[in-house]
Structure formats: structure tokens, C-alpha cells
A protein has these predicted regions:
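Extreme N-terminal starter segment of soluble prokaryotic enzymes
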Residues: 2-7, 174-176
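Short, surface-exposed acidic-centric catalytic microdomains
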Residues: 19-66
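Flexible, gly/pro- and Lys/Arg-enriched active-site loops
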Residues: 47-53, 67-70, 75-172
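Hydrophobic anchor at the beta1->P-loop junction of P-loop NTPases
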Residues: 179
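P-loop (Walker A) phosphate-binding loop of NTP-binding proteins
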Residues: 182
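Conserved lysine of the Walker
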Residues: 187
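Hydrophobic positions on the alpha1 helix immediately C-terminal to the Walker A/P-loop
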Residues: 190, 194
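Conserved substrate/cofactor phosphate-moiety recognition/catalytic segment
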Residues: 195-217
Length: 217
């Protein structure tokens, strides 16, 4: 079984979906690459009264050590305007990023506990987690994520939504997107892929009007 590094994302303030997109983009500004993305799930606030959350889980690849990865998560939260919690208990937040698993490591320190000590009690984590890592074995409880979800005592229902976190809503801001570059580097392939994924019209250049094609081919 491939070991995974898994992060959970949650937001219940402002534009919740955009917050998830933005958090992923900010994470990839660091030496982090996204491997797997779950669907977006909507769930009621857990442990306090507040607006519903959008939640998701992501499997990543990184050479960052656990403590350094935690620092990145905290930096992203701060960049997105998350304020430090006042007092004990849970509260609404623009973005919430938690390190659920770092491969099969068991980490217990004042600042970081991995696996996340409460993930097996929370359906808003287990539902998206089960989607991307159903057979991953919890290194302390020795059950798969699938088994933990099936045996969960949490009665909260996590409702899957149709949003695709792998496809940011770029056409909301740009009615047209132009792809430029050297001949033969894959512009047309990329443009066709975007057109298919976003169900958009592809406007290809005219080969007869491109003076550089003859010299290239």
C-alpha cells in the first residue's frame, strides 16, 4: 500500500469554494504537488453553531518534513486571513488546513499530532478521505479509512457536491484564454484539453496565416 501525506481543507466563511481553490493554489507555491483530490462535501458546523462548511481532502507529494509542512499550512491560513482562535472551542473560519497523515508516521508533540487525533470521529473528514484513500491503514487504530467511516459514530451527513477542485473556475474571470508559445511545445494539445474539461469552444489559429510554420516543418 502506497504511503500518503494527506491534508484536509475546510471553509465556512465567505466564498467557501473559492477559499478551497485558493488554498490549493497557495500550497502549490511551495515544494508541494497535488496527487489526489476528493470531491467537495458540504456539512453542518461540527462542535459549534455556525454556517455549513465546504470540506475536502487532498493527497500530496512533498519532501518537506512534518514540522515544516505544518508551518506551510499555518502560513497559508494566515495569508488567507484566518485569525488565531480566541479561547477554547471551535469557531467559523475562512480556511482550515489540517495534516491528517504523514505516511505512516506517529507524531506526538505540543504543536503537531499525526495522525490527527480526532479524524476517525468526524464524518466531514472521513467522507472525502475515504474517497481518495479508502484502503489506507490508520497507523494507530489499525483500521482502513473505509472501515473507520463505516464504523463512525458521527451522525453528521457529508453531502457530496459537483464542484471539481482540479478545475478552477477560470472562465468566470476571463471570457477568453490565449495560449502562446514556441511552435511544437504542446499549445494545441493543452488548448484541446482545456476545451474538453471546461466544455468550452476551441478557437484554433489559422495555419495558412502563420508565417513561421513552413520554416519549422
Amino acid at each position: 500500500m502506497e504511503e500518503q501525506i494527506i491534508i484536509s481543507l475546510g471553509s465556512n466563511l465567505g466564498d467557501r469554494l473559492n477559499a478551497l481553490y485558493k488554498a490549493l493554489a497557495l500550497l502549490e507555491a511551495y515544494p508541494i504537488s497535488i496527487k489526489l483530490l476528493s470531491k467537495v462535501y458540504e456539512t453542518p458546523a461540527w462542535g459549534f453553531k455556525g454556517e455549513p462548511f465546504y470540506n475536502a481532502c487532498v493527497s500530496i507529494k512533498t519532501k518537506l518534513k512534518p514540522k515544516d509542512l505544518l508551518e506551510v499550512l499555518l502560513k497559508v491560513e494566515k495569508t488567507m486571513g484566518r485569525l488565531p482562535s480566541k479561547g477554547k472551542g471551535y469557531s467559523s473560519r475562512t480556511i482550515d488546513l489540517d495534516l491528517l497523515f504523514y505516511k505512516s508516521k506517529n507524531i506526538f508533540s505540543a504543536k503537531l499530532k499525526v495522525p490527527h487525533p480526532k479524524l476517525h470521529k468526524r464524518n466531514f473528514v472521513l467522507a472525502p478521505l475515504c474517497e481518495i484513500a479508502p484502503k489506507f491503514i490508520h497507523p494507530i487504530l489499525f483500521q482502513t479509512i473505509e472501515e473507520l467511516f463505516q464504523n463512525s459514530s458521527d451522525r453528521i451527513i457529508a453531502t457530496p457536491l459537483t464542484y471539481d477542485l482540479g478545475l478552477p473556475p477560470i472562465f468566470k474571470s476571463f471570457p477568453y484564454i490565449v495560449i502562446e508559445g514556441n511552435i511544437g511545445v504542446g499549445k494545441t494539445t493543452l488548448a484541446k484539453l482545456l476545451a474538453v474539461n471546461y466544455n468550452s469552444k476551441l478557437l484554433s489559429e489559422s495555419f495558412t496565416k502563420n508565417p513561421f510554420l513552413e520554416a519549422f516543418y
